[in-house]
Regions:
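Active-site metal-binding loops of divalent metal-dependent hydrolases
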Residues: 53-54, 94-96, 135, 156-157, ...
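Bacterial N-terminal signal peptides
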Residues: 27-37
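Metallo-beta-lactamase
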Residues: 43, 111-122, 126-138, 156-210, ...
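Cap/insert and terminal regions of metallo-dependent hydrolase folds
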Residues: 107-111, 216-298
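Core dinuclear metal-dependent hydrolase active-site scaffold
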Residues: 47-52, 68, 73-75, 80-84, ...
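Pre-active-site segment of Zn-dependent metallo-hydrolases
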Residues: 58-80, 84-129
Length: 298
């Protein structure tokens, strides 16, 4: 029979390599955690502002929330969003300003989008980037107000509305041909960045997501902030009611896909409070007021 001393010695011999492996594993794990933490901290954090530049009074809620009472009306907010940080001033959507929209729509409380930035001390030429969530007139018409900005749009959105959409009268509702021509011209000038699909970080700390299906390839935006990720849903979620009642927007090409996008927004955002709908006037009361018509998303 082996002596206890010999057994202990053998156990020690076998244990040493195991302990060495364990220590190596712990070192690698700790390093990975530190790298991940450093990466998260190195992403720039932006200030995010919602800017109300106009109102559409008495808008039918049934055109915003699927299945809503047709008699319900709401004075909806027309908004753009400013992301400020990392040496950039980034707009999400550009609003509208051309005269013919005022005869086609009942617009009140209008401020030209380029002027609506003034309370934040931002001039039109200070805008470095404009992210167009989709090509509808009230989101894309003002892109040429910002002469030094790079315009970002989903590649499929540009290709569809510059081509196939016009082969039928039923596939370009809400799209103004002049806005399409402006976008094509800006592309020929080298000022358009094409976002190729879902989950694309186009600028450090700013990521575009697809799936809302408000238009052919509409996108929404996730923004890194000090409070965590803010989601700017734009028209992929018109009102808080869409999210709270888990109801798709009324104007979508795919209701199931729109609901999946809303569910995903909850996963992306640091908390549901930081999911910002596209036209809900309640945005202006849920967040701290910075100036008339301007709130800080936090």
């Amino acid at each position: 029979m082996e002596s206890p001393w010999v057994c202990e010695n053998l156990i020690s011999e076998y244990a040493r390599p195991c302990m060495s492996l364990i220590r190596s594993f712990l070192r690698v794990t700790a390093a990975a955690v530190l790298i991940a933490s450093a990466s998260a901290q190195s992403k720039p954090a932006y200030e995010v502002f919602a800017i109300r530049y106009a109102t559409l009074p008495d808008f039918p809620v049934a055109e915003l929330v699927a299945g809503a009472d047709p008699a319900r009306k709401l004075d909806i907010a027309m908004m753009i969003w400013l992301l400020r940080g990392n040496g950039r001033n980034i707009l999400v959507d550009s609003g509208f300003y051309r005269d013919h929209f005022f005869s086609e729509w009942k617009v009140s409380d209008f401020i030209k989008p380029s002027d609506a930035l003034q309370p934040l001390g931002v001039k039109p030429d200070d805008i470095t980037d404009v992210i167009i969530t989709h090509m509808h007139w009230d989101h894309a018409d003002g892109m040429d107000l910002f002469l030094k900005a790079r315009i970002w749009i989903q590649k499929d959105e540009l290709q569809y509305y510059a081509g196939e959409a016009w082969q039928s009268k039923d596939t370009h509702g809400g799209i103004d041909p002049d806005d399409v021509l402006t976008l094509v011209r800006l592309n020929t000038e080298g000022r358009v960045g094409l976002v190729d699909g879902d989950g694309q970080e186009i600028i450090p700390g700013v990521t575009c997501y697809t799936g809302g299906r408000h238009t052919y390839a509409s996108q929404y935006v996730g923004v890194n902030t000090a409070a965590g990720t803010v989601v700017l849903a734009s028209d992929n979620m018109y009102l808080y009611e869409n999210l709270e009642k888990h109801v798709p927007i009324a104007a979508t090409l795919d209701a199931a896909s729109n609901l999946r996008a809303q569910d995903r927004m909850k996963q992306i955002a640091a908390n549901p409070k930081l999911i910002v709908p596209g036209h809900d006037p309640a945005v202006m009361t849920k967040f701290p007021l910075v100036a008339p018509g301007v709130v800080r998303i936090q």
